[in-house]
UniProtKB/Swiss-Prot annotation:
Family recorded in the similarity comment: Belongs to the glycosyl hydrolase 5 (cellulase A) family.
Gene3D superfamilies: Glycosidases
Role description: Beta-glucanases participate in the metabolism of beta-glucan, the main structural component of the cell wall. It could also function biosynthetically as a transglycosylase.
Name of the protein in question: Glucan 1,3-beta-glucosidase
High-level lineage: Eukaryota, Fungi, Dikarya, Ascomycota, Saccharomycotina
Length: 435
């Protein structure tokens, strides 16, 4: 998820909770260029992805599980790097093993399938495969990734394995493992280590052993293109592509680096190099990380969302929205980083006051009146329609569950009727004018 920090271009009532919990329990129970395709695991030209991210599990994020970070000390660590550094390896491993084994379980995958989803994006950090010198991180995540893929197979879900964090940080966001400096390209050692990790990752997960489940390897999540050397990034993508091909036939996913649409049309282009095939561009879309977006009316939010799909439909590569949200504010606790407030109420970023965050800081169902639910539902439907338009390959919501938020929590949003059931149900059809 995008956390544009450092000026970079990312108590409920019992009766309400019971109603939502009951809904959730019943849900869980119940002009395109023709690109050469050499693997039958997924047809990006015709099949559509309806997916969800498993955030805050194998890569920690303070806004998803704030209790983990608050339990360390009064001096709350801001990311997984500082979390493990503060606890030391032995205690960090003990706590993370408990988190990994309880935060996501088999029943979650059953719930995803029952909700009509067909896909899961699973973030994992480089440190699950190799450590850089001096890293405080602990390992053990691969065991749980393996379990997740087994559960995907059991419930008919496809998956991407997403390298979410690189040494030195590719974006400075806490979800890269280390908040602050964007140091990934500062030394060739960091990039080289990332390439080595990709080799390990693709040799294990990119071959035939997982071809019934894995329909993509994402080379790197959200490299921040405006702060990185573009030529070096393209070189990394080329190397990563070749590693995937050396180890198997999995589709290769490259992130758009938050650069304009069409930036990567001539990167890994089949028409320029017939040996290149099955490359997908991953776009992430949010309207909550700048004051201008937060100030928009619901009609403006819908119009912006519709424009995404129209533009990306004309890109050379097939594209997919690998992260999006129902959120119309940045009010969720620590969304902008541990210890930080929100732009919406002017407690972060130094901008103008837009509105109160009092009822959105944590999961307060009283805020979600019929009118509020209607606005959120309109926005969600517009995004879904946009990301499914034309050759756009689908969408992956961020994220499946959180401790304390509603705007970012698919399970709670399903219970409120903000995310449609079935997923193609429309209360506000054809908002984008595509038909």
């Amino acid at each position: 998820m995008l956390f544009p920090v450092l000026h970079l271009p990312k108590a409920m009532k019992f009766s309400s909770f019971s109603l939502i919990a009951s809904s959730l329990l019943s849900l869980v129970a119940a002009a395109p260029v023709t690109l050469l395709k050499r693997d039958s695991r997924w047809d990006y030209a015709n099949d559509k992805i309806y997916g969800v991210n498993i955030g805050g599990w194998l890569v920690l994020e303070p806004f998803i599980t704030p209790s983990l970070f608050e339990a360390v000390s009064s001096d709350v660590p801001v990311d997984e790097y500082h979390y493990t550094e503060a606890l030391g390896k032995e205690e960090a491993e003990k706590r993370l093993q408990e988190h990994w084994s309880t935060w996501i379980k088999e029943e979650d995958f059953k719930g995803m399938a029952n909700a009509g989803l067909n896909f899961v994006r699973i973030p994992i950090g480089y440190w699950a495969f190799q450590l850089a010198e001096g890293d405080p991180y602990v390992q053990g995540q691969q065991e749980y990734l393996d379990k997740a893929l087994e559960w995907c197979a059991k419930y008919g879900l496809k998956a991407w394995v997403d390298l979410h964090g690189a040494p030195g940080s590719q974006n400075g966001f806490d979800n890269s493992g280390k908040r602050g400096e964007i140091g990934w390209q500062n030394t060739t050692g960091y990039v080289d280590l990332t390439v080595q990790v990709l080799d390990q990752l693709t040799s294990k997960y990119g071959g035939s052993n997982y071809s019934d489940v894995i329909i993509g390897i994402e080379l790197l999540n959200e490299p921040l293109g405006s702060y990185l050397d573009f030529d070096q990034l393209v070189d990394f993508y080329n190397k990563g592509y070749q590693l995937v091909r050396n180890n198997g036939n999995a589709p290769v996913i490259i992130h758009d680096a938050y650069l304009p649409d069409h930036t990567f049309d001539n990167v890994l282009n089949t028409e320029q190099d017939p040996n290149v095939w099955e490359v997908i561009v991953d776009h992430h879309h949010y309207q909550v990380f700048d004051e201008g977006s937060l100030s928009q009316s619901i009609d403006e939010h819908v119009s912006t969302a519709c424009g995404w799909g129209q533009s990306e439909n004309t890109e050379y590569h097939y594209s997919l929205c690998g992260e999006w949200t129902a959120a119309l504010t940045d009010c969720a606790k620590w969304l902008n980083g541990a210890g930080r407030g929100a732009r919406y109420d002017a407690t972060f970023g130094g901008g103008n006051y837009i509105g109160s965050c009092d009822q959105l800081y944590t999961a307060n169902y009283d805020y979600f009146t019929p009118e509020v639910i209607s606005n959120y539902r309109r926005y969600v439907e517009a995004q879904m329609d946009s990301f499914l338009y034309g050759k756009n390959a689908g969408w992956v919501f961020w994220c499946w569950k959180t401790e304390n938020t509603i705007e970012w929590d698919m399970q709670r949003l399903l219970g409120l009727g903000i995310i449609p059931q079935p997923l193609d149900d429309r209360q506000y059809p054809n908002q984008c004018g595509f038909s």
